[in-house]
Regions:
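Acidic, PIN/NYN-like endoribonuclease modules and their adjacent C-terminal/linker elements
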Residues: 1, 34, 114-142
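Short, well-structured N-terminal submotif of metal-dependent ribonuclease cores
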Residues: 1-44, 48-61, 135, 140
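Short, C-terminally biased terminal segments at protein or domain edges
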Residues: 14, 65-68, 126
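Generic structural signal for secondary-structure transition and capping sites
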Residues: 18, 30-31, 71, 75, ...
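Short alpha-helix boundary/capping motifs
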Residues: 38, 50, 69-73, 117-118, ...
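Active-site-proximal, substrate-binding regions of enzyme catalytic domains
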Residues: 42-93
């Protein structure tokens, strides 16, 4: 299983710069999908409507594609957002945020990925990438 940060997931389901790269990198692979992904992806798509970058119909299509990929097993729903994972994220923040600039959601994504034993970690966020490398996540290069 691979872990995509939400920025990569948005690119996978909605055309943006680097969408094709993400699509190629994920062909045939199972992708972790947590409640954090669900929240952030939904919010990101709604923000696109607010910014006039997407229509309501496009958002509904993306959300349906997500449901379809969950049903088909391309996305694997894993609910590991719990107090133990939050404690891991707090530990990562205490150890690394002062040097990487990583924010709470960066540390939470990395903590979620770390607890799953993923085979690859993809992110478009420089702070999250720095943290992922420091903690030994299998970062996949572009």
């Amino acid at each position: 299983m691979i872990y995509l940060d939400t920025g990569c997931l948005v690119k996978l389901y909605y055309p943006e710069e680097d969408s094709e790269v993400i699509a190629i990198k994920t062909v045939g692979l199972q992708i972790v999908f947590t409640p954090l992904h669900n929240l952030e992806l939904t919010s990101a798509m709604r923000l696109k409507v607010f910014r006039k970058e997407a229509t309501e119909d496009q958002v509904l299509d993306v959300l349906q594609f997500i449901r379809d990929d969950l049903a088909a097993g391309k996305l694997i729903a894993i609910d590991n957002v719990n107090s133990a994972t939050i404690q891991v994220a707090i530990g990562l923040s205490n150890q690394h945020s002062a040097t990487t600039g990583s924010r709470s959601l960066d540390t939470l994504h990395c903590a979620l990925a770390q607890t799953l034993g993923i085979t690859a970690f993809l992110t478009t966020d420089a702070r999250q990438l720095a943290l992922a490398k420091l903690i030994g996540l299998p970062v996949q290069k572009w």
